[in-house]
């Protein structure tokens, strides 16, 4: 079975970090976003991985080739015109066998093995409070009756979570071709939801399955919230002599921590250096350097340097000092 993972988006809401690093390669709680996704996908033992790349694809390609031992194919999406458009670029490789589609920008948890074994087309869903931000499904019993992209008037609270199993690849490829070649756009893009709706209207049964864990990584605040949620599962407390570690945290073995207070909710990636600082609720990326700073709710990008200046204070009893 094949797994198709579109990762061509520019991640504009995560700038400046995505100016130089693909969104899928951003670090959160010890791993990149794409590594979390691959961990879930490994359960179905794919025969081939197809990545649809575009923006900064030259950085993603070697990274993925090192991570995956099975055959990997890369397809270029020249313009980011929607998920249906992305899949249309890979249509020649999708016609024959059932496959999974997993969007490359959201960390999730689901029993994919059960879905694949059942063999019925299915969409991963999760109940949300505000469905206007998502594509949603409307059910008739267990089957999908209608799909709507980001409805302004509430029609369902079952949000599409970016994971799909397709049992009839030929029908999906034909439906995507109708959307793209017929210039059917919703909100300015060629949407996968429109292609899936065509499949439903053609009489194809599509069911849903629950996404147990769903962690948004679309903007800085969401990335930090995901970091907090994933760190809550980390039981080990790393030790760094001369520093105070307040769990939960994740610190790579190669990260250097000197005379600092780290945590809670901090991840420090490989090669990071944190010296004479207080850091909480933050992500410090690979080979980043933080010195003489108080950080909270911050993301320090790969190889970035954030440096303050040491201060000598003489503070009396019952006083309060805030360092900005």
Where are these regions (language model features)?
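Left-handed beta-helix
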Residues: 178-324
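Hydrophobic packing residues within well-ordered alpha-helices of enzyme cores
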Residues: 14, 60-64, 172, 176, ...
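Short internal beta-strands
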Residues: 50-54, 125, 283, 299
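Conserved N-terminal catalytic core of the sugar/cofactor nucleotidyltransferase
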Residues: 2-5, 13, 26-27, 31-103, ...
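A structural signal for short hydrophobic beta-strand segments in well-ordered beta-sheet cores
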Residues: 25, 137-139, 208
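Active-site metal-binding loops of divalent metal-dependent hydrolases
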Residues: 10, 105-106
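Short N-terminal binding/cap micro-motifs at the start of the first secondary-structure element
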Residues: 11-16, 132
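Conserved core of the sugar-phosphate nucleotidyltransferase
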Residues: 107-183
